[in-house]
């Protein structure tokens, strides 16, 4: 008996509480990590300046990164904590430095120091006398231009030539718009899938599938928070990708459930047994398709550039979560929803009537 045969005959619905608890523990761990360290939000969602340094003639990447860090911590008077050596200077907080092939990307957040105190750009309106939004943007653009000029001069002195510096600024209003658009995109995708499954199968199947998708997204967020992976537009693309990919495995399970329920021989079979059989029948397909996809994504995560890795890591989390929910959560959730709504429909209706030869009322139940 091979492993798939053993797994095929397992009692998945009966272990639903255990499998759900495992997912909840991961999600809770992600929430705790988010409360402690926060999400590693990219510049698209926070606003700020991103400086890219392209070093074509540099052979020692580690040395170049150290040189770049020394400039950030020394010449700019700004440390990675955002503290300014000169209290009169307005400096952006340095969030991180990442290596992307030959490009070194410095991401500066929206926190500034003014008169020795940290001031968030969202709260700088009281600090400026007029045109808060315009002035906030102008200050950031001016800093961006200064960074370009100073960093270019510094690196050219160190490496003579072959160094190009460029920067981009994302304002707070733009960051809010990107975040709002991302949330809408995910919500619309989930809503469309709910409608599709409700039409193709049943409303309860659709609800179970949507709960499984929400589980997948929450696991992706939790793991991303635990490992402090950057949350940017690439991450949103990964979420939408997983929503579209993982729903296929879930649909296969519900398609098998529908097929079994149509058979005359299954009319007296319980929902639990039908769900277990449907999971067992589709288990091999779900595992193998997920595994083959994972192999390619893992290779991208290992050998890809930083930008590709930022996409690959959430995809890996999502693929595992998707297979987990398709096998262990979606169908059992459907069983419990069916049980819940059947109980709601079959509540006993109490009628008072007198029994023969007695004055005591009798309670009759309508099934």
Regions inferred by a protein language model and the residue ranges of each:
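A structural signal for conserved, well-ordered secondary-structure elements
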Residues: 1-367
């Amino acid at each position: 008996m091979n492993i798939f045969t053993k797994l095929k005959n397992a009692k998945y619905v009966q272990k639903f509480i255990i499998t759900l608890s495992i997912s909840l523990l991961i999600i809770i761990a992600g929430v705790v990590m988010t409360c402690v360290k926060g999400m590693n939000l990219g510049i698209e969602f926070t606003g700020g300046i991103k400086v890219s340094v392209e070093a074509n003639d540099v052979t020692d990447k580690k040395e170049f990164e150290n040189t770049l860090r020394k400039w950030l911590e020394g010449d700019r008077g700004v440390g990675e904590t955002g503290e300014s050596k000169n209290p009169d200077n307005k400096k952006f907080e340095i969030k991180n430095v990442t290596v992307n092939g030959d490009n070194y990307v410095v991401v500066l957040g929206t926190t500034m120091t003014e008169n020795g105190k940290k001031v968030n750009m969202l709260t700088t309106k009281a600090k400026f006398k007029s045109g808060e939004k315009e002035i906030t943007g102008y200050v950031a653009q001016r800093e961006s231009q200064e960074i370009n000029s100073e960093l270019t001069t510094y690196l050219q002195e160190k490496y003579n030539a072959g160094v190009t510096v460029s920067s981009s600024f994302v304002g707070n209003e733009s960051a809010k718009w990107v975040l709002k658009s991302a949330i809408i995109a995910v919500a619309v995708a989930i809503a469309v899938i709910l409608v599709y499954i409700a039409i193709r199968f049943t409303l309860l199947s659709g609800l179970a599938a949507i709960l499984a998708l929400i589980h997948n997204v929450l696991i992706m967020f939790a793991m991303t928070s635990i490992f402090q992976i950057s949350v940017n537009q690439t991450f949103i693309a990964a979420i939408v990708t997983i929503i579209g990919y993982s729903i296929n495995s879930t649909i296969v399970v519900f398609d098998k459930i529908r097929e079994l329920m149509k058979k005359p021989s299954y009319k007296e079979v319980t929902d639990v047994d039908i769900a277990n059989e449907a999971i067992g029948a589709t288990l091999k397909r779900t595992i193998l398709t997920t595994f083959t996809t994972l192999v390619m994504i893992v290779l991208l995560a290992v050998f890809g550039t930083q930008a590709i890795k930022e996409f690959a890591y959430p995809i890996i989390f999502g693929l595992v979560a998707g297979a987990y929910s398709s096998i262990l959560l979606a169908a059992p959730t459907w069983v419990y929803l069916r049980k819940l709504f059947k109980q709601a429909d079959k509540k006993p209706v109490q009628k008072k009537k007198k029994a023969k030869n007695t004055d005591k009322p009798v309670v009759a139940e309508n099934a």
